[in-house]
Regions:
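Solvent-exposed, well-ordered amphipathic alpha-helical segments
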Residues: 13, 29-31, 84-85, 132-137, ...
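Hydrophobic/aromatic-rich core segments of domains that either
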Residues: 68, 123-189
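Intrinsically disordered, low-complexity segments enriched in Ser/Pro/Gly/Ala and basic residues
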Residues: 6-8, 23, 46, 191
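Membrane-interface motif at the C-terminal end of an N-terminal transmembrane signal
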Residues: 31-46
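N-terminal targeting leaders characterized by basic, low-complexity, disordered sequences
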Residues: 1-12
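Secondary-structure boundary elements
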Residues: 45-119, 151-152, 163, 201-214
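N-terminal Sec-pathway targeting helices
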Residues: 10-28
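Aromatic- and glycine-rich peptidoglycan recognition patches
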Residues: 181-214
């Protein structure tokens, strides 16, 4: 029997079938991936964040960025005695600001706050942290937030002293008393509906445990 010789057309036909098979596999794979995407969508990491959390953290990161700006610190330093320590700054601020609950005319820029001469816990804490940073001390802003809506409940500061962060509440005129908020009637418990965050150097850190009973 004479063997059948393979012609060019036969080889082309086989190659065509191979390419068709490859393309078919790719199309089927693409269809399966598309179906998988819609049935099992890739989880966006940000979806783990509760609604309002990013806006809350972004806001106070922005406040700290302005506080830490070279221009802000230079303007504030010009109003301070370079020999002031944190205790002096605490007393200096009390002489400059009056606690007023009226919500009109609030500022979050330290120099504007000082010009207005008034504020609540937010303004007192911003000015205090700004003054500390202006004189080269380590200080950060601390915010207690209602996690049901991510609005602030109270704001204070922490100073870095002897290797640890020390509680400072400029508007309440107290130092190193982190347990005091446990008895405050916020209508919500610290650690469950109330979370506490510290803001510094473009970052934030949850510090709820420092101020809770647990």
């Amino acid at each position: 029997m004479t063997p059948v010789k393979k012609t060019h057309s036969t080889r082309r036909h086989r190659q065509t079938r191979k390419w068709i098979a490859v393309v078919s596999i790719l199309l089927v794979t693409a269809m399966l991936l598309t179906l998988a995407y819609f049935w099992y969508p890739v989880k966006n990491p940000s979806s783990d964040e509760p609604p309002g959390f990013k806006a809350f953290t972004d806001h106070y990161l922005g406040v700290m960025k302005n506080i830490d700006a070279s221009k802000t610190k230079a303007e504030l330093a010009s109003q301070l005695n370079s020999k002031y320590n944190q205790t002096d700054l605490f007393a200096w601020e009390q002489s400059k600001l009056t606690f007023v609950q009226d919500p009109t005319g609030w500022f979050e820029d330290p120099n504007q706050i000082l010009n207005s001469g008034r504020g609540i816990c937010v303004q007192f804490s911003i000015v205090y942290v700004s003054a500390c940073l202006a004189l080269g001390y380590q200080s950060r802003l601390v915010v207690a937030a209602d996690t049901t809506n991510w609005n602030f409940i109270h704001v204070w500061a922490e100073d870095y002293y002897n290797g640890t962060w020390v509680h400072v509440d400029p508007s309440d005129k107290v130092w190193n008393s982190p347990s005091r908020y446990q008895s405050w009637d916020w209508g919500k418990a610290i650690g469950s509906e109330v979370k506490i965050y510290a803001f510094q150097d473009g970052k934030f850190q949850e510090v709820t445990k420092t101020y809770s009973r647990n």
